[in-house]
């Protein structure tokens, strides 16, 4: 529990913490095939960020900005503190999780052992003009009135965006 909210997470293995941070809008399910491979190397911790996966959701009444970076980061930092993640941390992060992980590392530099990331947010995107041209349409769609249906009902992010973002065949 973080405050009154439940943060769901998977924890497997023993040893130094390996923190898996998913992107938006996904969950710890993203790491389902990675966790078994890493659990022999340390204690793998894969939380569902607040509002995603099996973690509690914030009240709709709090408005459309209830999941700002600051809010999500605070829940993540408080969660890590609550479960005792403090030293020799390896962060493995994807997408939105990279921004959260990088910031946690900046705030806790003596706690970091290593960082690995993919599809990271490494610089600000101030406007749609800063986005890759072929991504603008779909991501604007996710932010439209149809966005919830596209993501939750049609699973377009997981089934469409992620697989189509791979630039080469995976081995």
Place the predicted regions along the sequence by residue.
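Flexible "cap/lid" subdomain of the alpha/beta-hydrolase fold that forms the substrate-access gate
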Residues: 4-10, 17, 30-31, 45, ...
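The serine-hydrolase catalytic nucleophile loop
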Residues: 24-35
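N-terminal cap/lid subdomain of alpha/beta-hydrolase-fold enzymes
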Residues: 36, 47-50
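A generic structural motif
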Residues: 40-44
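Short beta-strand element of the alpha/beta-hydrolase
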Residues: 16-22
């Amino acid at each position: 529990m973080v405050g009154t909210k439940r943060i769901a997470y998977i924890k497997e293995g023993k040893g130094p913490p390996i923190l898996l941070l998913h992107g938006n809008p996904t969950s710890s399910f993203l790491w389902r095939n990675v966790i078994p491979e890493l659990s022999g190397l340390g204690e793998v911790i894969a939380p569902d960020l607040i509002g995603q996966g099996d973690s509690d959701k914030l009240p709709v009444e709090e408005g459309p900005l209830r999941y700002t970076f600051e809010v999500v980061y605070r829940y993540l930092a408080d969660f890590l503190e609550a479960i005792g993640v403090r030293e020799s941390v390896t962060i493995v992060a994807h997408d939105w999780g990279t921004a959260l992980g990088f910031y946690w590392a900046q705030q806790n530099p003596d706690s970091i052992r290593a960082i690995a990331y993919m599809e990271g947010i490494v610089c600000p995107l101030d406007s749609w003009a800063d986005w890759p041209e072929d991504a603008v349409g779909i991501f604007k769609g996710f932010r439209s009135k149809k966005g919830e249906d596209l993501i939750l009902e049609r699973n377009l992010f997981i089934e469409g965006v992620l697989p189509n973002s791979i630039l080469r065949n995976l081995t």
